[in-house]
A protein has these predicted regions:
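Transmembrane helix boundary and interhelical junction motifs in multipass membrane proteins
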Residues: 21, 30-46, 119, 126-137
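Residues that mark transmembrane-helix kinks and helix-interface sites
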Residues: 40, 132, 148, 160-164
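Membrane-interfacial helix-loop-helix
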Residues: 1-26, 49-127, 152-204
């Protein structure tokens, strides 16, 4: 856990760097593929320091995150299984080094993807669920590429623009709320949204 804290602090240190915008893009990109620290923390720090640029920072986050998601998708699509249907060395590298990314989780996601692929990506992109797990598995399960990109743009856009809006609207005073409650609000909103669509589906 200590190494995660050090990584967290290292990411935050880029907020005051002349290369902060580049760091934000790279962080958002890599988090969609393998990096464990979400870009939100750097986005929040940068937006707090320049509130008027909050939406610009959010847009950079979105572009970086969706670009990384597409790379993750094609890693799953092209380099996840060999011709015999077995996991490649690259796949096992991810299983062995990304916390929480297990064979059991992979198999459970596979069952859900057949019916809920769009909503799975939306949920992973909008909530604190590890997005990288789903960008890769969506490619491995051959989710429709356009649908994957649309779900990623909508969910990542909603998440990062919402953070930017809260900071732009309320300023630094909103930071404690975002830190403590934003992920819970995101989870609750997503649960209600999906629940509503499920209810409509079974009523029609």
């Amino acid at each position: 856990m200590n190494h995660i804290k050090k990584l967290y602090d290292w990411v935050l240190s880029w907020a005051a760097s002349p290369y902060a915008l580049t760091a934000l893009f790279v962080l958002a990109f890599t988090e969609s593929v393998f990096f464990p620290i979400p870009p939100d923390i750097l986005l929040i720090a940068m937006a707090m320091g320049a509130v008027a640029k909050s939406f610009r920072f959010a847009l950079i986050c979105i572009i970086g995150s969706v670009s990384g998601a597409i790379v993750g998708y094609y890693i799953g699509n092209l380099a996840w299984l060999n011709s015999n249907g077995e996991f490649t060395g690259l796949a096992n590298l991810f299983f062995n080094n990304i916390p929480g990314f297990t064979h059991e989780l992979y198999n459970n996601i596979k069952i859900l993807f057949d019916e809920w692929d769009f909503w799975i990506i939306f949920t992973a992109g909008f909530t604190p669920i590890p997005y990288k797990v789903f960008t890769i598995t969506s490619g491995a399960f051959e989710m429709n590429t356009l649908m994957f990109i649309i779900a990623s743009v909508i969910s990542r856009g909603a998440r990062f623009f919402l953070v930017a809006y809260l900071i732009w609207k309320f300023g630094p005073s909103i930071k404690n709320f975002i830190d403590k409650y934003f992920n819970w609000v995101a989870l609750g909103f997503t649960a209600c949204l999906i629940g509503g669509f499920v209810l409509i589906k079974y009523m029609i």
